[in-house]
Amino acid sequence: MLLKVDVLVSGTVPAILAAKQATKTTPIVMVTNVDPVATGLVDSFARPGGNITGLTRLTKDLNGKRLELFKELVPGMSHVGVLWETEAVVASIGPIGVKEYEAAAREMKIGFQSLEVSGHNPDFEGAFQAAAKGRVNALITVRTAVLNRYAKQIAELATKNRLPSMHEGSEHVEAGGLVSYAASPHESFRRAAYYVDRILKKGAKPADLPVETPTKFELVINLKTAKQIGLTIPESVLYRADRVIK
């Protein structure tokens, strides 16, 4: 039995795509990590068109800023590896992220290596072996549902290989990763309530409500992990942390 709803709120790309396929009329408020224009969710940020609007936690140059912060946290970084899923629901997520990190690494004169895993049967052991062979001494993960699901395993392998790891979501740091720099998911969903209010109480149409990008980002650091891999976090970075896990 299908329930009639007045508005849908969705926080993952697979769910947003499923909702979009299911209805062209029910308003959908998204909270996503991808570029909603590049992935075809909306027509534009200013005029979404259709029945979808909301927020994206992805902003211009965010990955470059993330790498700069990572380099400040790990001054000895000379070769960064980017771990990504080749079969994400939105196929462009991995390649776009990898391209942005590679460009930032080139600008900073840091070596770069792409570390791909299959979404259906991810071989993380193989990816870390490739990283070791390529002399990678710092790791970044591209956030997807599959990599989130294996956050603990990725963190354990990074610690085992004494690799500092930067993540695009704090759930990886809570699972044992070293650091994350990203928009707060809690703030994003609180802001999503604004869209729901405009749609339900003010009669606004999703097509006319601009998609927002975040203005505040959270830096989360796991000091326990830093100690396990023998890394001393610079005071200048630690002081700016929004949350520290001990």
Question: Model-derived features: where do they sit?
Answer:
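Short hydrophobic alpha-helices and adjacent helix-cap/hinge residues
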Residues: M1-K246
